[in-house]
């Protein structure tokens, strides 16, 4: 039984109540009684509106389901379909042109194009690593990944391999030639660096040369000409630091004494309370809120053991350089600018219950997140004894990503919630900024109206292919069987979706004011492929794109040196490359021409993916992890990948492509494979052979067999219920 404290109409879990009063409120000048009275009022006032928005989702889905069922044997008449969506209020009139007016936004969002990390906030070590990933070693990123092939004697090995190291150095020199070229010759020919009359000079066998664009020299550290110093360069607003130490192990092997090239990498990071975490009760939520508080105060730390040594990981300090003329000082952020992703409007959490007559109802988690992540983020706006040594925003803003909103009314509700939270916290109106995830179909087709609803708060829009595909399938569940998962990336609607997001953002004045973002690279070990392919996102006009690790952030940062995103956006400005009809094109299989082995392959692939993710979520509370696929390729999985896999199989089941027996047989085939892939985890509990005793196995089965009944195809209700069962069992056994 949860120990609770009464606060007006609310009964708050003591663990949350004590955290707020003892840890979060001190240093904010907010009176505890006033705060809890404010929380009570916000929850009481906004809960009915939240419920109404969810009822509207269900109402629209029921109307769409009925429309498709009445026409299931007919080819889709796109004009009739569009008119129907207008008639029921799903597709809304497009607003007149407007420009966003958001103010007080940090440069990392308005002007600097670069990678964006997303990391589960419940894991302090991951969170610290991500916050510190503002700067990363290019040498380490190249040496430790498949960007440098392990051929011709260039294997990684257990100790430093000079052959591989030389290839790393050559690759980095080629990068410098493209990002900060010399006025003649190549960085590969460099034999030394110096600063003369405030200008960088690079010595070569043919004499000394400067940069082709001298203004790209931004500063230096250390004593000029000393054995250990560095040179700071800048290109497209991103910094490059060349570390020079001829006496270091790597510097000894380099003609110019260069020991590393460090890139400004994860310019922004999203600390995630949503799809990458498993937070089902007050204890889980407080763990996340406490880590978010520590990040904002700057005092979060974690004991880390590595290579037999233990050390304390803390947040990095800012970086200071001498200006090129030797007279001034330049300070650059040492940490990523932090967003926090709250949960969406759907789920409730028993961390707080609301008394409603004789009933007690769990409070909407999205309302709680806005209140408590907003409160704890106040400490990131100032420094002092009670607020910690570091700041997050330098412009007085708190950046909240809001996911899974369906249409402009839900965006407007979030803005109303943020305004009410600002009143409770005594913050100026407009302090809480919103990042809009364009990952639900009703938001995509009404994106301009969604942005207008948040025109004075919006700081980013972002496409999310996986969740968006999950909603695409669920919205049109009754229309017929969908194409295979791997074919989704080549559909008409996907290209239209990605292009429209950029076009609409630019038309609303995002250039120089807000981020336009694109999705995650999930194949964590395939960095060579990422370096080859992910450049397409800045080329498409995106000022940021998601990466799964600090190493990936450093490698992806190169793309923003190769591509001038600002110039791309100028080229795209004023263009409208898509139609609403393209966005509404449903990815139906034109004919069911799959061979039995193709169907089995698709079912097995999806069942393995579902089991591999769900077993860690339900049994261990791990919301984001590298999950090997059926071919043992490590993929970064979260609830978005689960949603698309489960919804596709639910769709095939609904239309008779597969049977319940096929699903069960595949799950039973794949469970031993997943068990084997987790064999090295001492805490892992196998699903086979007692499948029906495994709550994780049953959760995976539920997600598929009841997938058509899940609200908008979301996986959270089943995951939360099964995870709570696991925790209850553990509590009983203790």
UniProtKB/Swiss-Prot annotation:
Organism encoding this protein: Mycobacterium avium (strain 104)
Binding partners and assembly: Monomer.
Record InterPro entries: Malate_synth_C_sf, Malate_synth_sf, Malate_synthase_TIM, Malate_synthG, MS_C, MS_N, MS_N_TIM-barrel_dom, MSG_insertion
Name recorded for this polypeptide: Malate synthase G
Key words of the record: Cytoplasm, Glyoxylate bypass, Magnesium, Metal-binding, Oxidation, Transferase, Tricarboxylic acid cycle
Family annotation (CDD domains): malate_synt_G
Location(s), subcellular: Cytoplasm
Database matches in NCBIfam families: malate_syn_G, PRK02999.1
Name of the gene encoding the protein in the UniProt record: glcB
Reaction equation(s) it catalyzes: glyoxylate + acetyl-CoA + H2O = (S)-malate + CoA + H(+)
Protein's pathway: Carbohydrate metabolism; glyoxylate cycle; (S)-malate from isocitrate: step 2/2
Enzyme class per UniProt: transferase
Positions bound to glyoxylate: 341, 439, 464-467
């Amino acid at each position: 039984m949860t120990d609770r404290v009464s606060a007006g109409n609310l009964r708050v879990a003591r663990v949350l109540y004590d955290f707020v009063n003892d840890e979060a409120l001190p240093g904010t000048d907010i009176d505890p009684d006033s705060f809890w009275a404010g929380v009570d009022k916000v929850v009481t006032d906004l809960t009915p509106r939240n419920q109404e928005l969810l009822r509207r989702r269900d109402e629209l889905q029921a109307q769409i389901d009925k429309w498709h069922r009445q026409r299931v044997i007919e080819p889709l008449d796109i004009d009739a379909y569009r008119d129907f969506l207008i008639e029921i209020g799903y597709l809304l009139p497009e607003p007149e042109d407007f420009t966003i007016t958001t103010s007080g936004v940090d440069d990392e969002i308005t002007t600097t194009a670069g990678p964006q990390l997303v990391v589960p906030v419940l894991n302090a070590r991951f969170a610290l690593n991500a916050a510190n990933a503002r700067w990363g070693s290019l040498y380490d990123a190249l040496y430790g990944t498949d960007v440098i092939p392990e051929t011709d004697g260039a294997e990684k090995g257990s100790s430093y391999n000079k052959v591989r190291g030389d290839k790393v150095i050559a690759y980095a020199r080629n990068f410098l030639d493209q990002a900060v070229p010399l006025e003649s010759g190549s960085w590969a020919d460099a034999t030394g660096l110096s600063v003369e009359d405030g200008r960088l000079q690079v010595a070569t066998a043919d004499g000394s040369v400067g940069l082709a664009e001298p203004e790209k020299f931004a500063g230096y550290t250390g004593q000029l000409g000393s054995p250990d110093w560095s040179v700071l360069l800048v290109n497209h607003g991103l910094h490059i630091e060349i570390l020079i130490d001829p006496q270091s192990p790597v510097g000894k092997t380099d003609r110019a004494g260069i020991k590393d090239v460090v890139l400004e990498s994860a310019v922004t990071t999203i600390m995630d309370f949503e799809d990458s975490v498993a937070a089902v009760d007050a204890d889980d939520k407080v763990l996340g809120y406490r880590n978010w508080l520590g990040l904002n105060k700057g005092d979060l730390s974690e004991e880390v053991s590595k290579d037999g040594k233990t050390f304390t990981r803390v947040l990095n300090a800012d970086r200071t350089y001498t200006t090129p003329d030797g007279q001034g000082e330049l300070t650059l952020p040492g940490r990523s600018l932090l967003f926090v992703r709250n949960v969406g409007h759907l789920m409730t959490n028993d961390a707080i219950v609301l008394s409603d007559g004789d009933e007690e109802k769990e409070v909407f988690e999205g309302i709680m997140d806005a209140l408590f992540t907003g409160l704890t983020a106040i400490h990131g706006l100032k420094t002092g004894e009670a607020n910690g040594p570091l700041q997050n925003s330098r412009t007085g803003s708190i950046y909240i990503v809001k996911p899974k909103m369906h249409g402009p009314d839900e965006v407007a509700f979030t803005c109303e919630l943020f305004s009410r939270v600002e009143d409770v916290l005594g913050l100026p109106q407009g302090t809480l900024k919103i990042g809009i995830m364009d990952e639900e179909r009703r938001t995509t087709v009404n994106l301009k109206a969604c942005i207008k609803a948040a025109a004075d708060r919006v700081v980013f829009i972002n496409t999310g292919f996986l969740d968006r595909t999950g909603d695409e399938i669920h919205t049109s569940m009754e229309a017929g069987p969908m194409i295979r998962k791997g074919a989704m990336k080549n559909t008409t609607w996907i290209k239209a979706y990605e292009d429209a997001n950029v076009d609409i953002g630019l038309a609303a004045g995002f250039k120089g004011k807000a981020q336009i973002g694109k999705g995650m690279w999930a194949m964590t070990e395939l960095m060579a492929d990422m370096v080859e392919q992910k450049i397409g996102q800045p080329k498409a006009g995106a000022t940021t794109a998601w990466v799964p690790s600090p190493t990936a952030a450093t490698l992806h940062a190169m793309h923003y040196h190769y591509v001038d995103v600002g110039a791309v956006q100028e080229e795209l400005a004023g263009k409208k490359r898509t139609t609403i009809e393209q966005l509404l094109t449903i990815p139906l299989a034109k004919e069911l021409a799959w061979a039995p082995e193709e169907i089995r392959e698709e079912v097995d692939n999806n069942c393995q993916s579902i089991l591999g993710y769900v077993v860690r979520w339900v049994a261990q509370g791990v919301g984001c992890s590298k999950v090997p696929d059926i071919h043992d390729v490590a993929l970064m999985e979260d609830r978005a990948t689960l949603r698309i896999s489960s919804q596709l199989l639910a769709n095939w089941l609904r239309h008779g492509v597969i049977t319940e027996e096929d699903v069960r047989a595949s799950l039973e085939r794949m469970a031993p494979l997943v068990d084997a892939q987790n064999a090295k985890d001492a805490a892992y509990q196998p699903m086979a052979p007692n499948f029906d005793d495994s709550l994780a196995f049953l959760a995976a089965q539920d997600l598929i067999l009841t997938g058509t009944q899940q609200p908008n195809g979301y996986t959270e209700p089943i995951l939360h219920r099964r995870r709570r069962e696991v925790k209850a069992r553990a509590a009983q056994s203790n």
